[in-house]
Swiss-Prot record:
Transmembrane segments: 702-722
PANTHER family: CADHERIN 23, CADHERIN-23
Signal peptide positions on this chain: 1-21
Biased composition annotated in UniProt, kind: Pro residues: 790-800
Matching InterPro entries: Cadherin (IPR039808), Cadherin-like_dom (IPR002126), Cadherin-like_sf (IPR015919), Cadherin_CS (IPR020894)
Protein name, entry field: Cadherin-related family member 1
Keyword Transmembrane: yes
Compositionally biased intervals (Low complexity): 817-827
Function: Potential calcium-dependent cell-adhesion protein. May be required for the structural integrity of the outer segment (OS) of photoreceptor cells.
Glycosylation sites per record: N58, N89, N288, N297
Record field: compositional bias (Polar residues): 802-816
Tissue: Expressed in the retina. Strongly expressed by the mitral and tufted cells in the main and accessory olfactory bulbs. Also expressed in the septum and olfactory cortex. Weakly expressed in the triangular septal nucleus and piriform cortex.
Residue ranges of domain Cadherin in the record: 36-135, 136-247, 248-354, 360-473, 474-577, 569-691
Gene from which this protein is expressed: Cdhr1
Length: 859
């Protein structure tokens, strides 16, 4: 009973104790590399941007009470971080710099409101490549002797980089225009004179080289970066005595004028020690004194002449001057020599002068033929030019003054004296016909003297004529028009040719030749063209002549011109009727026509007018004066009217018709015309007879009508055969024509008509007069049933001047008439003036006949 209350008491006290106990919160320790916990062994790169969330404090309270976080720093240090008290997020608020502060001490704490737990942490700042190399002990100025051996070490540069690792390692290299003479060790920074290189104080007293120091690179803000630095090393070259004296102002030329006094200074030679850093004293002397003509001052280097220049024999003297260095101890050192050229200058007191074979001369004459060969030398001119001065005063130019481009003078530049040569440059310009003589001035003028002395000489060239021109006509062609009835020996036209050459070469001889020249002559001296004494010209035979006329000089040089002669027609032919007595039949109401021809060549001589000069009885017929158509007067309209006019009551009349040309004077011819008059009723009784009567005077009309009828019959036959063939073709069968003819025989009237036409055609053709048998055009070797076409007589042979290769052909024309007529004698053509004129045919007529024969050969 007693133990129960005690136990209860103990339990009660325990509960009260437990209720009043509160345990402290604590941080989690998550180890290295964790971004939350108690920041144990936490490190942070120095390039972390300000404001970055870098860590999260994380802890807990055993009772589960709310906790808060805090971070604090030593008052003597910076507050680098801040913390969110509720969530424990730590933020960087200051930039980190490992080179200044590689560790940061901080106190972090956690509290549940009653208990506060604090811990001291060390935050390691890790390196980033944020530092560039930096050279130590700048600036770099060093002194190096110029005789330093190649490959020697001359200096060492040093740079440091505060970064660690590769970012803190430094390498060196050169970046300079003079890097070809120097080199640097990339690891140690030692500068050396490159192998094969030398220093020369006299050429370059200082060298400036740029050395670059570069780190090994590293990460910075998430990128790989490399930093570098540069410095300039000034290398001053120290002079040493290693160079001979140097002459200043070389080369040395001195001039002594011929009026210079003895003892006058000519020029001064200047030399300096080649080692300019520590120069020695210089002494001068002449190695050759030129026979005592010149001397030199040993300290100043001044050279003087000792004698009068007029006594000097040479124009140019060459001296050799030697200089010697004297060191501080007074002993000779390095030496040098230099040549000195001294020229004796002549005064310009003589102008250039021209000389001939007998002495000074200012005029030269020469005779030569025109048009000499290109490049020929005028050997007849003996010219010498001289300038008595010396040197530049005796230098002058030569040139010709006058018409340019004809001659060229050689030489063009002369020193002292030269033989003058004149060469032909333009042969065409040396023309006797243009100029009988050529005059030039030969000018010599000094080149480099201020006085510019000059001299001139006249050159006169007399030209001799040669036969270099061809006679030339005043025109390329001559046109003449003469009447056809001019008598023989009449003047036609005068041609003129001119030869500008002189003497016998300028005389011109004329001659003519060519087709059409046989009827003409030319005076050999005057060029007058006239007709042959026996020539008889006829415009109706040949109306135009053309030939060539030649003008020739005595050497055979010639030119040609063409002459055209046109014959003017003269009314010398009478109109001619075909027959002097003609019989014609006139159908009442239809005119008939008569025709006369006039053989004159041109109008109006060959135009014919017709008139009735006599009629019995009169006032029955009218005639058209231009066409020759004869018709009854309008008042006569029937045979009864005609019957009442004649006393005998006949229908036949005799008329005398006149044909008169329009020439001046005019010619006329008359013919007797017998006319039989009938009317249409009589002709209708026999249509064929009427047709024959109507075509009595025109047989070709009858032939044409018959040929037309035959052509129509043949065409109808061809159409019937073609239609039959195409009809059978549609049924894929080809039937012989004979079968078609049997099925469909020709109507009887057609047969009668064709037989009648054949009869008439054979009857009419029997009256034709054929000159030769026609060829077998059907090529069947059978002439039975073949109608022979009429043929005209063969053409006469072509003229002798025509080509013999043209074949003679026959012309298929009708040579008969439907009604026989008594033969009529054609008028005899007028002779062409004898055998000479009959053989003369113009070229135009020949071409026309050739063309006509060629065309007929293909008919």
């Amino acid at each position: 009973m007693r133990r129960g209350p005690q136990v209860a008491l103990v339990l009660g006290l325990l509960c009260i104790y437990l209720a009043q106990a509160n345990f402290a919160p604590h941080f989690f320790d998550n180890g290295v590399g964790s971004t939350n916990g108690n920041m144990a062994l936490f490190s942070l790169p120095e390039d972390t941007p300000v404001g970055s969330h870098v860590y999260t404090l994380n802890g807990t309270d055993p009772e589960g009470d709310p906790i808060s976080y805090h971070i604090s720093f030593d008052p003597s240090t910076r507050s680098v971080f801040s913390v969110d008290p509720n969530f424990g997020n730590i933020t960087l608020v200051e930039e980190l710099d490992r080179e200044r502060e590689d560790e940061i001490e901080a106190i972090i704490s956690i509290s549940d409101g009653l208990n506060l737990v604090a811990e001291k942490v060390v935050i390691v700042v890790t390196d980033a490549n944020d530092e560039a190399p930096r050279f130590l002990q700048e600036p770099y100025n060093i002194l190096v002797p110029e005789n330093t051996p190649a490959g020697s070490s001359i200096f060492k540069v040093q740079a440091e980089d505060k970064d660690t690792g590769s970012g803190g390692s430094v390498t060196y290299f050169l970046q300079s225009l003079h890097s070809s003479k120097f080199t640097v060790d990339r690891h140690s920074g030692v500068l050396r004179l490159q192998a094969g290189a030398t220093l020369d104080y006299e050429k370059s007293r200082a060298h400036f080289i740029t050395v670059v120091a570069k780190d090994g690179g590293g990460r910075l803000r998430g990128a790989d970066v490399v930093f570098s630095a540069t410095t300039t090393v000034t290398i001053n070259v120290e002079d040493v005595q290693d160079t001979a004296p140097i002459f200043v102002g070389t080369p040395y030329y001195g001039y002594v004028y011929e009026d210079t006094l003895p003892g006058s200074e000519v020029l001064t030679v200047v030399a300096i020690d080649g080692d300019r850093g520590k120069p020695n004293h210089i002494l001068y002397r002449l190695l050759n004194e030129s026979d005592g003509l010149f001397e030199i001052n040993e300290t100043s280097g001044a050279i003087s002449v000792l004698q009068s220049p007029a006594q000097l024999r040479r124009e140019v003297y060459e001296l050799h001057v030697q200089v010697t260095e004297v060191n501080s101890s007074g002993s000779p050192a390095a030496q040098s020599t230099v040549p000195v050229i001294i020229r004796i200058v002549d005064l310009n007191n003589h102008p250039p002068t021209f000389y001939g074979e007998s002495g000074p001369q200012n005029k030269f004459e020469l005779s030569m033929f025109e048009h000499p060969p290109q490049g020929e030398i005028l050997r007849g001119l003996k010219i010498t030019v001289n300038d008595s001065d010396q040197g530049a005063n005796a230098k002058f130019n030569l040139r010709l003054v006058g018409p340019g481009g004809i001659f060229r003078v050689v030489p063009q530049t002369v020193l002292n004296e030269a033989q003058v040569t004149i060469i032909v440059e333009n042969s065409a310009a040396i023309d006797f016909e243009k100029s009988k003589s050529l005059t030039f001035k030969l000018l010599a003028i000094e080149v480099n003297t201020p006085e510019k002395f000059s001299s001139t000489a006249d050159i006169v060239i007399q030209l001799l004529d040669t036969n270099d021109n061809v006679p030339k006509f005043t025109s390329h062609y001559y046109i003449a028009r003469i009447p056809e009835n001019v008598p023989g020996g009449s003047n036609v036209v005068a041609v003129t040719a001119v030869d500008p050459d002189t003497g016998p070469w300028g005389k011109v001889q004329y001659s003519i030749y060519g087709t059409g020249s046989d009827l003409f002559l030319i005076h050999p001296s005057t060029g007058l063209i006239y007709t042959q004494p026996w020539a008889s010209l006829d415009a109706e035979g040949t109306s135009r002549y053309n030939f060539y006329v030649k003008a020739e000089d005595m050497d055979g040089r010639y030119s040609l011109a063409e002459v055209f002669v046109t014959l003017l027609d003269v009314n010398d032919h009478y109109p001619q009727f075909v027959q002097s007595v003609q019989e014609k039949t006139m159908v009442l109401g239809t005119p008939l026509k008569i025709e006369a021809t006039d053989q004159d060549a041109e109008e109006p001589n060959n135009l014919v007018d017709y008139s009735i000069t006599r009629a019995e009885p009169v006032n029955v017929f009218d005639i058209d004066a231009h066409t020759g158509e004869i018709r009854l007067k309008n008042s006569i309209r029937s045979l009864e009217a005609l019957h009442n006019i004649t006393p005998s009551g006949e229908y036949s009349w005799s008329l005398q018709v006149q044909a008169k040309d329009r020439g001046s004077p005019s010619f006329s011819t008359t013919a007797l015309l017998k006319i039989d008059i009938t009317d249409t009723e009589r002709l209708s009784r026999s249509s064929m007879a009427a047709f024959l009567i109507q075509t009595k005077d025109n047989p070709m009309k009858a032939v044409g009508v018959l040929a037309g009828v035959m052509a129509i019959v043949v065409a109808i036959t061809v159409l019937i055969s073609t239609a039959t063939f195409w009809r059978n073709k549609k049924s894929n069968k080809v039937l012989p024509v004979r079968r078609v003819l049997r099925r469909r025989p020709s109507p009887a009237p057609h047969t009668v008509r064709i037989e009648w036409l054949k009869f008439r055609r054979a009857k009419a053709a029997s009256k034709f007069i054929l000159k030769e048998d026609p060829p077998n055009e059907n090529c069947n070797n059978s002439r039975v049933g073949v109608t022979v076409p009429p043929r005209a007589p063969a053409l006469p042979p072509p003229p002798k001047m025509a080509s013999s290769t043209v074949a003679q052909q026959t012309v298929p024309t009708v040579s008969g008439s439907l009604t026989p007529q008594p033969s009529q004698q054609l008028p005899t053509p007028k002779p062409l003036g004898g055998p000479a004129q009959s053989s003369l045919v113009s070229e135009l007529k020949q071409k026309f006949e050739k063309k006509s024969l060629g065309n007929k050969a293909y008919v």
